[in-house]
Amino acid sequence: MTERENNVYKAKLAEQAERYDEMVEAMKKVASMDVELTVEERNLLSVAYKNVIGARRASWRIITSIEQKEENKGAEEKLEMIKTYRGQVEKELRDICSDILNVLEKHLIPCATSGESKVFYYKMKGDYHRYLAEFATGSDRKDAAENSLIAYKAASDIAMNDLPPTHPIRLGLALNFSVFYYEILNSPDRACRLAKAAFDDAIAELDTLSEESYKDSTLIMQLLRDNLTLWTSDMQAEEVDPNAGDGEPKEQIQDVEDQDVS
């Protein structure tokens, strides 16, 4: 086996063993060869990072939720411990995001030649800046949000020209970009417009849906519709009562990283 094949096989082994940190290392070696990745290699890289970041994002949400409960009780000593612990998780999140963003910037985006791979990588860039914006504050949050917006817009411009509306990567981009508008920019109107346009465009061209991407595309369309339903009901509730939902746990908004699709 060549070095490239060797690392791809290592990544597959690590995935089966659920050792995602090692999967990341193997696929980073492939990415650093400065070649255009195959669809399989690209998906392995995405799955590896999705799992290492996903575990920390879930931890951060749980810790933040506990922190809010303890704040309501006024438990100062516990709050100090929680803040320190949250800081550790945030450092891990920052390190993972800066790692993949570096790989994208130095190797993957410069070597991408097809429209599909460019959309895939710019979407990834938008996603990982969005993950930074989820927990950052002040100017760090502003910078992460701006970088995310620029990357998502670059991906969207290419997707509109090069990919059909039913393509799972174009649909996944629309899903995550709309979540960015809703959660990071607090712009439910734009989030709903983007999600609805992507869903409607895909419905109008359902006959172009290829057999191999049918499952992924229809799953993402369902997620777009689920988010639209959730967002419109939230917006209607706020119109009736501006304080609706304050202090209540919110239903989880779905993005494509929460699902088993790439």
From Swiss-Prot:
Coiled-coil region: none
Listed GO biological process terms: axon guidance; determination of adult lifespan; DNA damage checkpoint signaling; germ cell migration; germarium-derived oocyte fate determination; microtubule sliding; negative regulation of neuron projection arborization; oocyte microtubule cytoskeleton polarization
Effect of substituting E183K: Suppressor of sev-Ras1 V12; subviable
Protein keywords: Phosphoprotein
Cross-referenced Pfam families: 14-3-3
Gene3D superfamilies with a match to the protein in the record: 14-3-3 domain
Region span, Disordered: 236-262
SMART domains per the UniProt record, alphabetical: 14_3_3 (SM00101)
GO cellular-component term (any): nucleoplasm
GO MF annotation, one: protein heterodimerization activity
Record-linked InterPro entries: 14-3-3, 14-3-3_CS, 14-3-3_dom_sf, 14-3-3_domain
Origin: domain of life: Eukaryota
Subunit-level organization: Homodimer. Interacts with phosphorylated yki. Interacts with pav (when serine phosphorylated); the interaction is necessary for association of the complex pav-14-3-3epsilon complex to the microtubules, thereby inhibiting microtubule sliding.
Functional note: Positively regulates Ras-mediated pathways. Acts downstream or parallel to Raf, but upstream of nuclear factors in Ras signaling. Three mutants have been isolated, that suppress the rough eye phenotype caused by mutated Ras1 (sev-Ras1 v12). Inhibits yki activity by restricting its nuclear localization. Together with pav, has a role in the inhibition of microtubule sliding during neurite outgrowth.
Protein's name according to its UniProt entry: 14-3-3 protein epsilon
Organism name: Drosophila melanogaster (Fruit fly)
Protein's gene: 14-3-3epsilon
